[in-house]
Amino acid sequence: MSEREVLQKINSPEGKEDRIIGKHVFGNLYDIDAERLNDKEFLEKLVLEAVDIAHMKLVEIKAWSFGGKKGGVSVIALVEESHIALHTWNEYNYATLDVYTCGEDSDPQSAFAHIVNALNPKRYQMFYADRSSQ
């Protein structure tokens, strides 16, 4: 099959059903209020809101608190489309955020933006990776 034929197949309605659409938004959040970063219930609620905002379907959510110097909270939402993972280090006023979705209907950028806006870091980095099969 020529390159042109492959592109025609991928862009056809049938071809779109045959390929995987992967959108991965991830980043680092700096200088966040430490109290928010240690509030497991707040962070879990925040991730649940992000799931809804991004039009994802929740399968399960788990949250854990960790003590010690490098302690914080981890919240993982397993969604039908993939996942949202938020990890915090309260003593460092730092968090990492990972939003990965498969399919055309979900919007990982809106989930990422919602969490960033709620945590209100003084600065953050956001990265995007296209993880589609074609």
Curated annotation (Swiss-Prot):
Annotated positions of the Pyruvic acid (Ser) modification: 82
Name the coenzymes or cofactors required: pyruvate
Q: Mind telling me how this protein is modified after translation?
A: Is synthesized initially as an inactive proenzyme. Formation of the active enzyme involves a self-maturation process in which the active site pyruvoyl group is generated from an internal serine residue via an autocatalytic post-translational modification. Two non-identical subunits are generated from the proenzyme in this reaction, and the pyruvate is formed at the N-terminus of the alpha chain, which is derived from the carboxyl end of the proenzyme.
pH-related activity note: Optimum pH is 6.
Instruction: Give an example GO cellular component term for this record.
Output: cytosol
Q: Which pathway is this protein assigned to? A: Amine and polyamine biosynthesis; agmatine biosynthesis; agmatine from L-arginine: step 1/1
**What does UniProt note on temperature dependence for this protein?**
Optimum temperature is 80 degrees Celsius. Highly thermostable. Retains 80% activity after incubation at 90 degrees Celsius for 10 minutes.
Q: How is its activity regulated?
A: Highly competitively inhibited by L-argininamide and L-arginine methyl ester. Also inhibited by alpha-difluoromethylarginine. Is not stimulated by potassium chloride as observed for other decarboxylases.
Picking any one GO molecular function of the record gives: arginine decarboxylase activity
Q: Which GO terms describe its biological process?
A: arginine catabolic process; polyamine biosynthetic process
InterPro entries in UniProt: AdoMetDC_fam_prok, ArgDC, S-AdoMet_deCO2ase_core, S-AdoMet_deCOase_pro-enz
Q: Into which EC class is this enzyme placed?
A: lyase
Active site: which residues?
Answer: 82 (schiff-base intermediate with substrate), 87 (proton acceptor), 102 (proton donor)
Catalyzed reaction equations: L-arginine + H(+) = agmatine + CO2
Which residues make up the annotated site Cleavage (non-hydrolytic)?
A: 81-82
Q: Name one Pfam family in it.
A: AdoMet_dc
Which SUPFAM superfamilies does this one have?
A: S-adenosylmethionine decarboxylase (SSF56276)
Report the PANTHER family cross-referenced here: S-ADENOSYLMETHIONINE DECARBOXYLASE PROENZYME
Q: Miscellaneous notes for this chain?
A: A chimeric protein containing the beta subunit of SSO0536 and the alpha subunit of SSO0585 (SpeH) has ArgDC activity and no AdoMetDC activity, implicating residues responsible for substrate specificity in the beta subunit. But additional factors in the alpha subunit are required for efficient cleavage and turnover.
Task of the protein = Specifically catalyzes the decarboxylation of L-arginine to agmatine. Is also able to decarboxylate L-canavanine, although less efficiently. Has no S-adenosylmethionine decarboxylase (AdoMetDC) activity.
Q: How does it assemble?
A: Heterooctamer of four alpha and four beta chains arranged as a tetramer of alpha/beta heterodimers.
The protein's name in its UniProt record: Arginine decarboxylase proenzyme
